[in-house]
């Protein structure tokens, strides 16, 4: 096969349709089972849910997965509006009052009983914040706000508390926070290809420019079972960050954003406006299907918890120079913990309708326990299930099933003020107000006022903020509208 032909090859995954339509009785039963996790692990005093079964701690990422589960439970008829409202009111009230790391952003972890800051051993104290976790939370707060505008005021008040001074810079780079040996905050760039861009979409939905975080570069291509899979080419040895390639961020972007840009309000399920996210997702999927076809090993790779030490691993398609690398966050190679991730399997099933994902559904359908939800995964080596239950796994499974019924989970409310469903946004009106004393100190984004905001300002005598000087002009390599040239998808061993 000539190089040109290789470059023009289309992966089979690109032709697989997504699954859309009402849930079957079988699929609805899976949704009901997944929701049981959030019944068993709910903390009524705070409205939070344990990230791991019977362990009273959570993160912003896992709490966003709870919002996904809560939305799916209501939309799929598992709970009614009263139950949904009561849970969401309590959750948002807690999120609006939790102590923040350095009075800036949500801490990396909270005790679900007390809603106080804790470390990863659930001991009181603050340890930093994660821009990746917060990006997922921002995305789900936006979904809640758009789907249920009656809660928009509560959602906006949550985000208006946050000080974005250190989490995002003028070039659109996302940073996390840690504490040094003297308990002083240290801010470092956070995120690698896939996770970084997924989190950036959450910030974009609130008006932030995430130019550096949202671009695919720098990346290289790994030849994995005939598929050229993109991976982040920043050196893990010098950056102390592993370049995990996992299913999860690509699946989540597909389920929640429809592989669209953050400003795409189209309801067309067949079109995907993001310039490369679907293409890269197809590659990550295809490498896993090809692995099954070539080796006979069912594959659905993602990060997951364990029921034994080391308790958490990144189970990857590629990481740190190796295909199918299963490592801890410290980089220790632990191949015996490789597993079929249930959330990855069901997410792939929703986004790629194929005989392979049919088989994945068959193997995971009953992999759970009554009142606990679904297992975290099934060991690839045949050692049985990972007998651990988590909010993230069950939450993503629920949103995958909701995607089948409703399509893209982010559904914008109308921005037509004459429409009865229109909801004015406290966030937007605060951001355009030149007299608000926290807009600049909290590094809130500048948004261009639309007709509704201009009209509101004229009616109330509020002066509009002027566009700031081009702070991002010092970032010449980053252009939001830069054209994207997709790399070749396959090597010569894949037949056209």
What is the predicted role of each segment?
Residues 1-487, 493-496:
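Ser/Thr/Asn(+Pro)-rich, low-complexity disordered segments
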């Amino acid at each position: 096969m000539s190089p040109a032909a290789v470059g023009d090859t289309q992966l089979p995954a690109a032709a697989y349709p997504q699954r859309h339509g009402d849930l079957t009785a079988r699929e609805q039963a899976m949704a009901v089972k997944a929701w049981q996790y959030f019944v068993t692990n709910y903390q009524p005093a705070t409205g939070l849910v344990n990230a791991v079964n019977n362990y009273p701690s959570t993160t912003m990422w896992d709490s966003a997965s709870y919002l996904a589960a809560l939305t799916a439970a209501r939309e799929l008829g598992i709970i009614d509006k009263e139950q949904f409202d009561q849970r969401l009111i309590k959750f948002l009230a807690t999120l609006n009052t939790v102590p923040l790391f350095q009075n800036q952003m949500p801490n990396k972890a909270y005790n679900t009983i007390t809603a106080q800051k804790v470390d990863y051993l659930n001991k009181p104290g603050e340890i930093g914040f994660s821009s990746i976790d917060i990006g997922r939370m921002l995305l789900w707060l936006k979904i809640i706000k758009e789907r249920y505008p009656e809660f928009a005021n509560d959602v906006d008040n949550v985000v208006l508390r946050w000080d974005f001074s250190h989490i995002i810079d003028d070039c659109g780079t996302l940073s996390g926070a840690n504490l040094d040996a003297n308990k002083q905050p240290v801010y470092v760039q956070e995120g690698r290809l896939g996770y970084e861009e997924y989190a950036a979409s959450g910030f974009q939905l609130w008006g932030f420019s995430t130019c550096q975080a949202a671009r695919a570069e720098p990346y290289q291509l790994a030849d994995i079972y005939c598929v050229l899979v993109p991976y982040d080419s920043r050196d893990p040895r010098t950056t102390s960050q592993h370049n995990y390639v996992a299913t999860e961020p690509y699946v989540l972007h597909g389920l929640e954003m429809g592989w669209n840009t953050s400003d795409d309000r189209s309801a067309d399920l067949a079109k995907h406006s993001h310039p490369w996210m679907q293409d890269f997702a197809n590659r990550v999927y295809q490498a896993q299907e090809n692995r099954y076809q070539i080796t006979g090993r069912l594959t659905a790779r993602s990060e997951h918890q364990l029921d034994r030490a080391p308790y958490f691993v990144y189970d990857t398609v590629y990481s740190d120079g190796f295909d199918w690398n299963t490592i801890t966050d410290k980089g220790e190679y632990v191949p015996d913990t490789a597993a079929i991730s249930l959330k990855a399997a069901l997410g792939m099933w929703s986004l790629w309708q194929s005989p392979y994902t049919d088989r994945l559904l068959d193997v995971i359908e009953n992999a759970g326990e009554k009142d606990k939800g679904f297992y975290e995964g099934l060991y690839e080596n045949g050692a049985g299930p990972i007998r651990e239950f988590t909010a993230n796994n069950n939450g993503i499974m629920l949103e995958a099933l909701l995607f089948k019924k409703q399509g893209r989970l982010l559904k914008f409310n109308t921005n037509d003020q004459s429409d009865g469903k229109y909801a004015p946004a406290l966030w937007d009106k605060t951001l355009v107000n030149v007299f608000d004393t926290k807009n600049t100190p909290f590094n809130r984004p500048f948004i261009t006022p639309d007709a509704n905001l201009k009209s509101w300002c004229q009616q109330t005598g509020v002066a509009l903020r002027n566009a700031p000087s081009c702070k991002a002009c010092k970032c010449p390599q980053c252009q939001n509208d830069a054209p994207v040239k997709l790399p070749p998808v396959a090597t010569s061993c894949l037949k056209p």
